[in-house]
Amino acid sequence: MSNLVMVGGGNDSALAPHPLRATILGEVHARPFSAVPAPARILHFAFDTQGDRSAADREQLIAFCQTRGLVPPLPQDKHFRVTLGGTQLRWEQHSEFTTYTWEVPVEDKASAFHPSASSLAIPMRLVRQPGPVLVAVDLHVVQQSQNESGFVNLFDQTSLAVAESGDGAALYATDFKVTPEGFIRILLIDRGMSPNRTGSMVQHLLDIETYRTLALLGLPEAHRLAPSISLAEKRLGEVTQRMRRSDDLDDNNQMLNELTA
């Protein structure tokens, strides 16, 4: 993967990259994905595990596996996958959050988002909640049907977002609305993808929703601080104007105290 952005021809036509650009872009492809044959139902949770919660969650997952005779994650593992009966669990630990992604059995002819996500999420109760939940996604992979256009009725029309893959092999939709059960619903219509490609797309869709939520986490605090910041900016402007007009030492000292208080 090139770290350069070319804007024309020649050796001097590349934009200077940020020193962390390659690392950030590589993160998207650093985690291996698993093949997902359609149809499939994926329930994805992201929890705030800052501080001591991260280590505690790892310890309880190890104990969870050991008590069931399953091979636990290694101490250095950041990604882990295990099978519980017919359910697949994928666990990922990041710097500030941890995800539990459950792929649960689904009937071939099951209607979209049926049965309910809450009834399928019972396996999440088998492990101790690692921290406050930030993200809960109900992603349903369905195979193309004759009445494909009917999916629009599953979502709020005022916020419905729909996209199609470049070759038309997949269509995905969401309205970003939280259901009464607390989930964001994403529908992925498979029009002939391989299980590997479906798995890759599932991971990217879950990443988009997870990081979209995390990116907005600081917004309430920004709103709370906005009046104080506006007041500080106003006072800074006033002091700057006084500095331009003042030649008195005592007055200058007073303004310095105001700036550094």
Language model regions located:
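Extended alpha-helical interaction modules
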Residues: 92, 102-257
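N-terminal pre-transmembrane cytosolic regions of membrane proteins
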Residues: 1-140
